[in-house]
Amino acid sequence: MLQATGVILAGGRSRRMGQEKALLEVGREAMIRRVAGVLKEVFAEVIISGGVEENGLRLGLRVVPDLIAGGGPLSGIHAALCGAAFAKCLVVACDMPFICPELARYMMEQSEGYDVAVPRHGQHLQPLFAVYSKGCIRAIEESLRAHKCKVIDFYPLVRVNYVSEENLRALADIEVAFFNVNTPSDLVKARVMAENSRTGRVWLV
């Protein structure tokens, strides 16, 4: 069990989905419950950032509200870092139903000596499956005050390890692990992916 905090980011408005995503079921289980189950395998503390209090009650987890409103996911990361019991947090979006413990542990290892460890995935980064330390708090606050609300906007102000895609692929099928559910068609695809897995969870062990 890692002495760190797993954070489920659940405060999004889900405009493209048209309803709250956290409670939508994939593999006969709410997405937020799937994510929580994986994080509980790895982290000594698991919390929810944003979203409704009922989600925390269902899962027996503490919900931390935004302290600086209007910054989207960056506000959620800030609230989580301020409220976490440990110095480092792995932040995971609630709409990533196929994350795996192996990647979570590896990302924590890759955060040693850095304020942020973020995966590369193709031409993009995965800032909502990334490790952030409490050393980021001031930089995030500075970014939010300047209305720079993309998660990666504060990265130039801190020490960042951009984790190679090749190393991640050695641990898991990252096309599956990083699949996120934004639209109704994504939800259909995720349910098919889960159904095609005997365990209801699609990852490489």
UniProtKB/Swiss-Prot annotation:
Organism (species): Pelotomaculum thermopropionicum (strain DSM 13744 / JCM 10971 / SI)
Enzyme nomenclature, EC number: 2.7.7.77
Pfam family, one: NTP_transf_3
InterPro entries: MobA-like_NTP_Trfase (IPR025877), Molybde_CF_guanTrfase (IPR013482), Nucleotide-diphossugar_trans (IPR029044)
GO molecular function: GTP binding; metal ion binding; molybdenum cofactor guanylyltransferase activity
Binding site for GTP: L9, A10, G11, K21, D66, D95
HAMAP family: MobA
GO BP term, pick one: bis(molybdopterin guanine dinucleotide)molybdenum biosynthetic process
Protein name: Probable molybdenum cofactor guanylyltransferase
Similarity section: Belongs to the MobA family.
Reaction(s) catalysed (UniProt annotation): Mo-molybdopterin + GTP + H(+) = Mo-molybdopterin guanine dinucleotide + diphosphate
KW Nuclease (keyword) present: no
Cofactor(s) annotated in UniProt: Mg(2+)
Keyword Chloroplast assigned: no
Keyword annotations: Cytoplasm, GTP-binding, Magnesium, Metal-binding, Molybdenum cofactor biosynthesis, Nucleotide-binding, Transferase
Higher taxonomy: Bacteria, Bacillati, Bacillota, Clostridia, Eubacteriales
Primary location: cytoplasm
Role noted for this protein: Transfers a GMP moiety from GTP to Mo-molybdopterin (Mo-MPT) cofactor (Moco or molybdenum cofactor) to form Mo-molybdopterin guanine dinucleotide (Mo-MGD) cofactor.
Binding site for Mg(2+): D95
Subcellular location: Cytoplasm
Gene Ontology CC terms, in alphabetical order: cytoplasm
